[in-house]
């Protein structure tokens, strides 16, 4: 069943055939919920002795864990350890008698090709703004219930290609399944912990999370890589013109 969800997610042509945004976003949201439910359905048969199972498809990684003994923090990571989510146990009231179940999910998706999710934040930006959703999503659910954290926050790490953006260029977002939109209330971008290839977020609840780049359309247009590439291409074009002109002059 996880493989079926993976195939659906990877069907770029199929997503592009859904022209109604609300239907497309609802379908995407249903996939996220379906994957979580798969994890809890699987763990319903687990004995509670700290068992961990990992399921990996082309673009979805599902991690399920049951545990009684509580460490200070439980972390889950993507298959390449590039994306991480850490849950502080001090922020949640666990029952010593019941088995605690964690379901964590990692998604790789090319949203610029499939448009599975909106590229804007609810009530703040619009589809016309120059925003882009990072192609990695992270999800976590505990005991299949709504968890609101107060004393400590969930920590998320997203690795990505180098970006040259100010703080306004990266926003930590979470998926609002009720509104079928990205929201940022309750999530904060950590400028101190983040780097050019790393975005760190802190959030006060559990759901599916992502990162929105170039949130205000303020990306630096003079990125050194793009500048170098443009210089090389322009130089080659100029050289080609000179060679062509010389060839034409010699053949007259």
Regions of interest found by a model, annotated:
Residues 1-170:
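Extracellular GAIN/GPS-associated region
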Residues 2, 22-25, 150, 166, ...:
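Intrinsic disorder
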Residues 18, 61, 185, 213-214:
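A generic "cationic amphipathic patch" detector
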Residues 121, 136-140, 180-184, 191-192, ...:
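Short amphipathic alpha-helical surface micro-motifs
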Residues 128-130, 177, 219:
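Homeobox/homeodomain signature
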Residues 147-212:
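Proteolytic-maturation and junctional protease-sensitive modules
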Residues 193, 202-207, 211-252:
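Hydrophobic alpha-helical transmembrane segments corresponding to the first two to three helices
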């Amino acid at each position: 069943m996880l493989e079926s969800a993976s195939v659906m997610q990877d069907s770029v042509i199929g997503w592009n055939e859904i022209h109604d945004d609300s239907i497309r976003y609802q379908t995407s949201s249903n996939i996220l919920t379906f994957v979580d439910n798969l994890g809890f359905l699987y763990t319903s048969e687990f004995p509670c002795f700290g068992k961990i199972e990992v399921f990996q498809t082309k673009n979805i990684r599902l991690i399920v864990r049951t545990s009684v003994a509580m460490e200070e923090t439980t972390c889950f990571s993507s298959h390449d350890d590039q994306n991480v989510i850490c849950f502080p146990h001090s922020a949640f009231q666990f029952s010593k008698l019941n088995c605690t179940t964690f379901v964590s999910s990692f998604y790789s998706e090319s949203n610029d090709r499939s448009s599975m999710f909106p590229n804007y934040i609810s009530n703040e930006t619009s589809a016309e703004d120059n925003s882009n959703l990072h192609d990695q999503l992270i999800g976590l659910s505990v005991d299949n219930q709504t968890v609101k954290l107060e004393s400590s926050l969930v920590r998320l790490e997203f690795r990505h290609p180098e970006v040259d953006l100010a703080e306004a260029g990266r926003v930590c977002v979470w998926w609002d399944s009720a509104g079928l939109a990205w929201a940022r209330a309750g999530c904060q971008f950590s400028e101190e912990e983040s780097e050019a290839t790393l975005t760190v977020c802190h959030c006060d609840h559990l759901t599916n999370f992502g990162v929105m780049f170039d949130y205000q359309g303020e990306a630096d247009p003079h990125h050194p890589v793009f500048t170098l590439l443009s210089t090389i291409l322009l130089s080659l074009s100029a050289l080609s013109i000179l060679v062509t002109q010389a060839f034409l002059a010699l053949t007259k």
